[in-house]
């Protein structure tokens, strides 16, 4: 990741543009996320607002924190719905890179942001592998088992950490401006 000026000066291939960021900290519990997802929703909403996300025009890809645990996944589903509204949340294509890579602790956020940029660039939503019996509380499009082609315009990557440290980065597909 570097400034546009620097990337253009050296002739680098540009995959996506960082257009938004949000963060929150709720200190709800040492390890458990807030059960209603309210603090995480603030980080997601901040990033989407800063990115000027328009649910009527943009096709959104969400790289969920998605740890595959009942507490995290239901809380994150609620957070997405609160941040975007139910209708827009149902249009989003969501996946968990962790289903492919496992949880890499400190490296996870960077790897998932790179995966999000590549998804935008190639127009491919990676699958959430192993998702055969979703939790009824996780009722959004979590792209189970199979990758999908899509003309994505915006991606967000959620990192929801211990102690309620929540971060969300928004990317926009690079159009070569």
What are these language model-derived features?
Residues 1-53, 60-61, 176-177:
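Condensing-enzyme catalytic core mediating Claisen C-C bond formation in acyl metabolism
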Residues 43-53, 79, 83, 116, ...:
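Stable alpha-helical structural segments in soluble proteins, enriched in small hydrophobic residues
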Residues 1-6, 108-177:
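Conserved beta-strand-centric core segments of catalytic alpha/beta enzyme folds
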Residues 21-35, 64-73, 90-141:
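Acyl-CoA/ACP chain-elongation machinery
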Residues 11, 52-55, 84-90:
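Short helix-capping segments at alpha-helix termini
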Residues 2, 13, 35-43, 71, ...:
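Conserved active-site and cofactor/substrate-binding residues in soluble primary-metabolism enzymes
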Residues 61-64, 157:
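Conserved beta-strand positions
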Residues 72-87:
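Active-site-proximal gating segment of KS-fold condensing enzymes and close homologs
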